[in-house]
């Protein structure tokens, strides 16, 4: 009986199998971003990723042998759920495409304030893709105010086009990440 002298293949730590074609596409896209960042020595960024997509991205980076020092996930604030994958090889100039838009409601006292669904619905009404939008934070200490983390291009579009959320008029202010207040952890 013939026997192989090769040792049994080792399991790859951190492997997460893709379940759908979209997930397989995401993993290939992350590998392509990693190759481009490493090959050209320039920073590359993904769109905003959900928790599952972040796990798949980590698995793809693991499979592509990208060192942990060359990538991180950034959501704009410490408690962020939706985050960008930032591939920043050593020696590159990082220029994160992340920004924050402050939305302030202009309502009469006693009027109902919009909720998270209202904000998300209004942003989707601008025909923005979900990958362009990160977390929407509604701080409890400042009712009528929301902070939307987004890609720079989406943030600029929000500032130009968003006039109301639900039936409530809003004013928009584009903030740098340094200007974002600290939010209490939920």
Please give the residue ranges for each predicted region.
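Non-catalytic terminal extensions of ATP-dependent helicases
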Residues: 2-186
């Amino acid at each position: 009986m013939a026997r192989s002298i090769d040792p049994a293949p080792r399991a790859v730590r951190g492997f997460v199998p893709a379940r759908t074609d979209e997930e397989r596409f995401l993993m290939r896209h992350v590998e392509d971003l990693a190759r481009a960042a490493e090959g050209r020595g320039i920073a590359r960024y993904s769109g905003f990723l959900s928790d599952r997509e972040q796990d798949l991205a980590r698995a793809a980076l693991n499979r592509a042998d990208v060192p942990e020092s060359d990538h991180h996930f950034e959501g704009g604030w410490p408690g962020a759920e939706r985050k960008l994958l930032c591939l920043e090889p050593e020696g590159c100039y990082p220029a994160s495409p992340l920004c924050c838009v402050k939305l302030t409601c202009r309502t009469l006292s006693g009027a109902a304030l919009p909720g998270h669904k209202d904000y998300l619905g209004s942003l989707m009404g601008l025909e923005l893709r979900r990958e362009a939008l990160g977390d929407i934070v509604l701080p409890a200490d400042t009712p009528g105010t929301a902070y939307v983390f987004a890609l720079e291009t989406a943030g600029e579009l929000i500032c130009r086009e968003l006039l109301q959320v639900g039936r409530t008029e809003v004013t928009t202010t584009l903030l740098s990440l340094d200007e974002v207040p600290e939010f209490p952890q939920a």
